[in-house]
Swiss-Prot record:
This is Calmodulin-binding protein 60 G. It comes from the Eukaryota. InterPro entries: Calmod_bind_C, Calmod_bind_M, Calmodulin_bind_N, CBP60. Residues 1-76 are annotated as: Calmodulin-binding. GO terms for molecular function: calmodulin binding; DNA-binding transcription factor activity; sequence-specific DNA binding. Transcription activator that binds DNA in a sequence-specific manner, 5'-GAAATTTTGG-3', to promote the expression of target genes. Recruited to the promoter of ICS1 and other defense-related genes (e.g. PR1, PR2 and EDS5) in response to both biotic (e.g. Pseudomonas syringae pv. maculicola ES4326, P.syringae pv. tomato DC3000, and microbe-associated molecular patterns (MAMPs) such as flg22) and abiotic stresses (e.g. UV-B, drought and abscisic acid), thus triggering rapid defense responses by stimulating salicylic acid (SA) biosynthesis. Induction: Induced rapidly by pathogenic bacteria Pseudomonas syringae pv. maculicola ES4326 and P.syringae pv. tomato DC3000, by the root-colonizing endophytic plant growth-promoting fungus Piriformospora indica, and by microbe-associated molecular patterns (MAMPs) such as flg22 and hrcC in both local and systemic leaves in both local and systemic leaves. Accumulates transiently in response to 12-oxo-phytodienoic acid (OPDA). Residues 147-263 are annotated as: DNA-binding. Expressed in seedlings, roots, leaves, inflorescences and flowers, and, to a lower extent, in siliques. Particularly present in guard cells.
């Protein structure tokens, strides 16, 4: 019997795909039976394969599942105090700010170092099985601030990459300990910035691949996109660095623009203006800048490493006085006629520096490197003054002097001496009419041993010297004044370089309360020789006139001192 175009056959039986005109009932029955057999076979095979695969997978994972269960059970019952007595720790940490794709190193550019230490004694563990273990590096959340933690707590703070991003920490993330020390020499780097975290920072973590030591955790640090590396601040800055490399000065910002308008383009320019006129520099950056910001900028600029071979000299208006500056115009030393002046009064130094800073066009560079160690070889001074007064006989004479603003004369030069010769103090006069001197009163009692006055013969290069001795007594004009009275017989002849006695000479020393010093006056000089007499009279008039002028200016500035 053939079935042709039967409606019942073409109904919802599911066999409409067969061509009815070629099928017979017998064929249909055979087809159905064969399909049922195939379905049953496939079902049976599927169940069998599932069972086999399940058994094999369970057999393969059984060791891992059992150790994981044991570890989980241990972590539930574990407390921070019951953990291993060994721990990992970072000896150094990355800088406070790094960039994506950049190798993670310490602040000074050295590799990061991890050590295995004893948690009790905090000493290095250089022996034992754990001293040669493998360490795994992981990225941590910066909010992980607990002082002690469990394994579960540490793993919970391990960060993973954002969706669609590469692994957060890339590179060689394993380090082998050697004698308990591991050095991270591989190029490990973060592939993403830290702006998406709550704290906007990362930490670097380290843990043993097997259990046995407490994990390590670095300090927190920010990670910015690599395109911001061109705006990176330099620590320490170089003198030639652009000024925006300093902290708190943004590139193309307001402060950088203002500084550029004043030709302050580099860190060296910044340091120079700070030395010469820091108030002006502060006003350029902005009078409204906070004190904290200002201190941060200055502190960073002061970290600049200067070139010690770059020096400048300034020849002062006072003949013979030369100032030596470093590359940012900071005063190094003061020299007179090639000799360094030590322990010069601060007001005098301030006056000399102010003069130099007002005449920056007269500051010249020194190209000779030997000048730094031996400035006296390069400092050229004018001829010696025509009149010299020298006081000797004391080991600790602190005879100091300063300059009158209206004068170009040098007031004092400290004369170097050997260990066997008492130091001399040289008071120099030129043709100017004013000069002033003072001596520390604590050394005054030792000053009475001798007093020497010399006049230099500019034509023959010879000097006449007279020496006196005397005592101390009160002066009726001033209760704080003293007088040296010298009484000696003068020899009949004089020759250059010899000592000659003086008949009578008065040296008046007046105390000044402001500095606790003594002003020196010469008066009532009576010498046996006309040449020596003229020498003394000239000294008396010059010095007394100078001190009267100084006292008048001092009283005008401080009216109370004149009362």
């Amino acid at each position: 019997m053939k079935i042709r175009n039967s409606p019942s056959f073409h109904g919802g039986s599911g066999y409409s795909v067969f061509r009815a005109r070629n099928l017979t009932f017998k064929k249909v029955v055979k087809k159905v039976m064969r399909d049922q057999s195939n379905n049953q076979f496939m079902i049976q095979m599927e169940n069998m394969i599932r069972r086999i695969v399940r058994e094999e997978i369970q057999r393969s994972l059984q060791p891992f599942l059992s150790s994981s269960c044991v570890s989980m059970e241990r972590s539930r019952s574990e407390t921070p105090s019951s953990r291993s007595r060994l721990k990992l720790c970072f000896i150094n940490s990355p800088p406070s700010s790094i960039f994506t794709g950049s190798k993670i190193e310490a602040e000074d550019g050295s590799p990061l170092v991890i050590e295995l230490v004893d948690a009790t004694t905090n000493t290095l563990v250089s022996t034992g099985p754990f001293s040669s273990s493998r360490v795994e590096l992981v990225p941590l959340n910066a909010d992980f601030t607990e002082e002690s933690w469990t394994v579960e707590g540490f793993n919970r703070n391990i960060l993973t990459q954002r969706e669609g991003k590469r692994p957060l920490l890339t590179g060689d993330l394993t380090v082998m300990l050697k004698n308990g020390v591991g050095v991270i020499t591989g190029d490990i780097a973060f592939s993403d910035n830290s702006s998406w975290t709550r704290s906007r920072k990362f930490r670097l973590g380290a843990k043993l691949t097997g259990d046995g030591a407490v994990e390590a955790r670095s300090e927190a640090f920010g990670c910015r996109d690599q395109r911001g590396e061109s705006y990176k601040k330099h620590h320490p800055p170089c003198p030639s660095d652009e000024v925006w490399r300093l902290e708190k000065i943004a590139k193309d910002g307001v402060s950088a623009t203002r500084l550029a308008e004043r030709k302050i383009l580099t860190v060296k320019d910044f340091r120079r203006l700070y030395t010469v006129n820091r108030n002006e520099l502060h006003n350029i950056i902005g009078a409204g800048v906070s004190k904290k910001t200002w201190n941060t900028i200055v502190s960073h600029a002061m970290d600049c490493v200067l070139d010690e071979t770059e020096c400048y000299i300034y020849n002062a208006n006072t003949p013979g006085v030369t100032l030596l500056f470093n590359s940012v115009y900071e005063l190094i030393r003061v020299s007179f006629n090639g000799n360094d002046i030590q322990n010069l009064d601060q007001p005098i130094l301030d006056q000399l520096k102010a003069e130099a800073y007002q005449n920056l066009n007269r500051i010249t560079a020194v190209n000779d490197r030997t000048f730094v160690g031996h400035p006296q070889r390069s400092l050229q001074c004018p001829q010696d003054p025509g009149f010299v007064v020298t006081c000797s006989g004391s080991q600790h004479i602190d005879f100091q002097g300063s300059l009158d603003p209206s004068s170009s004369s040098m007031a004092l030069c400290h004369k170097a001496s050997s260990s066997t010769v008492h130091p001399d103090v040289l008071m120099s006069f030129d043709n100017s009419s004013t000069a002033r001197f003072h001596i520390d009163k604590k050394f005054l009692p030792t000053f009475g041993n001798s007093f020497k006055v010399s006049e230099l013969d500019q034509v023959h290069g010879k000097s006449q010297t007279v020496v006196t001795k005397g005592c101390i007594e009160n002066n009726e004009e001033d209760e704080n004044a003293f007088s040296y009275h010298h009484h000696d017989d003068m020899t009949s002849s004089w020759s250059p370089g010899t000592h000659q006695a003086v008949e009578t000479m008065f040296l008046t020393v007046s105390e000044t309360e402001e500095a606790g010093m003594f002003d020196v006056h010469f008066a009532n000089v009576n010498l046996g020789s006309p040449r020596a007499r003229w020498c003394k009279v000239k000294a008396a008039f010059k010095v007394r006139a100078a001190f009267k002028e100084v006292r008048r200016h001092t009283t005008a500035r401080n009216p109370r001192e004149g009362l």
